[in-house]
Amino acid sequence: MKPSLFLTALCLGIASAAPKLDQNLDADWYKWKATHGRLYGMNEEGWRRAVWEKNMKMIELHNQEYSQGKHGFSMAMNAFGDMTNEEFRQVMNGFQNQKHKKGKVFHESLVLEVPKSVDWREKGYVTAVKNQGQCGSCWAFSATGALEGQMFRKTGKLVSLSEQNLVDCSRPQGNQGCNGGLMDNAFQYVKDNGGLDTEESYPYLGRETNSCTYKPECSAANDTGFVDIPQREKALMKAVATVGPISVAIDAGHSSFQFYKSGIYYDPDCSSKDLDHGVLVVGYGFEGTDSNSSKFWIVKNSWGPEWGWNGYVKMAKDQNNHCGISTAASYPTV
């Protein structure tokens, strides 16, 4: 995100007329601020409160409709409550939607049958949910997640890998640190570099350091390249079932996703082409007794465990590539 964009949005808010606030929400506002450690200047407090109230009322309306069966998922107030949707998209979503296919191609014809449900968390392939903070580094978290899974598949050891290593060091491959990147570029960096450090040795800072401090002796992963999956959900399903967790990009720019809490996420406005957020598919499944209905992808996000379904989201599966989940899927080869 460019700081000037944030400042512009902020200044526009401050310059507007003083908003009329709902005093009935005072206690909720003070509790939310305390929970998330928010401190504002005198001029900013009213504007942020107004944004928060607008988001709160939108969430309440959605959940009323959810209780009436009009939606398949619920929403909840969270750490993004004082952000406009425009700010949210600028700060949190850092996938660069300009994929240049350079990897091998996944051959789905070699896979005949797959299970009706898969969850690689149950097999030890997936680390705990992480938090990218206010840095557009989603691509790095998606990439480490896929590489962590493949290294576990190869070695039987699950080691948390360093997103900061990717943020600091993969600019020559085309990534832009906190201003966005591509998972395939990250996989290419690991191959070119000959390794990727552990999270423990190269901890995440949530900002750019303008200095690459990779230490070969602390490397815990390597790859030989990457595989791009054909842009079909059936191909993605076969890859998830047979390979492990898969890096994908989605359209995550909607308020409904910003405040997602539980259930199967489906928003008719979600695009299959305008992708802005890198995440990790760790499995798939279905709700109820009919495996042909209420199907979902199990998606690991990088906004902390308090967001959504303990840091995850169930995304509608086999609904015309909803939110573009199969548009830019890939995984590293190790």
UniProtKB/Swiss-Prot annotation:
Chain positions recorded as Zn(2+) 2 binding sites: E163, E199
Membrane topology note: Peripheral membrane protein
GO cellular component annotations of the record: apical plasma membrane; chromaffin granule; extracellular space; lysosome
UniProt xrefs under Gene3D superfamilies: Cysteine proteinases
Catalytic residues of the enzyme: C138, H277, N301
Annotated glycan sites: N222, N292
Residues noted as binding Zn(2+) 7 in the record, renumbered to the chain: D276
Binding site for Zn(2+) 5: D251, H254
Activity regulation note: Inhibited by the propeptide produced by autocleavage. Long isoform of CD74/Ii chain stabilizes the conformation of mature CTSL by binding to its active site and serving as a chaperone to help maintain a pool of mature enzyme in endocytic compartments and extracellular space of APCs. IFNG enhances the conversion into the CTSL mature and active form. Inhibited by CST6. Inhibited by the glycopeptide antibiotic teicoplanin. Inhibited by amantadine.
PROSITE patterns assigned: THIOL_PROTEASE_ASN, THIOL_PROTEASE_CYS, THIOL_PROTEASE_HIS
PTM note: During export along the endocytic pathway, pro-CTSL undergoes several proteolytic cleavages to generate the CTSL single-chain and two-chain mature forms, composed of a heavy chain linked to a light chain by disulfide bonds. Autocleavage; produces the single-chain CTSL after cleavage of the propeptide. The cleavage can be intermolecular.
Residues bound to Zn(2+) 6: D274
Residues that coordinate or bind Zn(2+) 1: E122
Enzymatic reactions: Specificity close to that of papain. As compared to cathepsin B, cathepsin L exhibits higher activity toward protein substrates, but has little activity on Z-Arg-Arg-NHMec, and no peptidyl-dipeptidase activity
Signal peptide range: 1-17
Subcellular location: Lysosome; Apical cell membrane; Cytoplasmic vesicle, Secretory vesicle, Chromaffin granule; Secreted, Extracellular space
Protein residues bound to Zn(2+) 3: D184, D228
Assembly, per entry: Dimer of a heavy and a light chain linked by disulfide bonds. Interacts with Long isoform of CD74/Ii chain; the interaction stabilizes the conformation of mature CTSL.
Family: Belongs to the peptidase C1 family.
Name by which UniProt lists this protein: Procathepsin L
Organism: Sus scrofa
